[in-house]
Amino acid sequence: RNTQRQSSVAQIINAVYQYAIDNSSLPTAITTTSTEICNNGYNTTVNLCSINTLVNLSVLMPDYLVKIPKDPQRMDTDAGTNFFINRDIYGRIVVSGIGENGATISITR
């Protein structure tokens, strides 16, 4: 499952950068605080991203991602993806997840 997590983290960071290239800016929801990414699309009747203070990356769909990847252990009904995103002090994007056996899965770009 960690291989799948690594692939998902790469998909997210690639989509964010493609969005930034096309729009000359990062999605505004990304802050300097590492925050869990919202599982967009699992519930369209209530904006649970803001209720649960999760990062809403719906601006990436459908042009950059068909849907936001979620951890393989997460259910479709979970509000969060178990993947986290933030800008570091140098302005780079960090996308990370928690792997099995305590492994940290992270890409900084």
Segments predicted by a language model, with ranges:
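Alpha-helix exit/C-cap motif
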Residues: 7-34, 40, 66-71
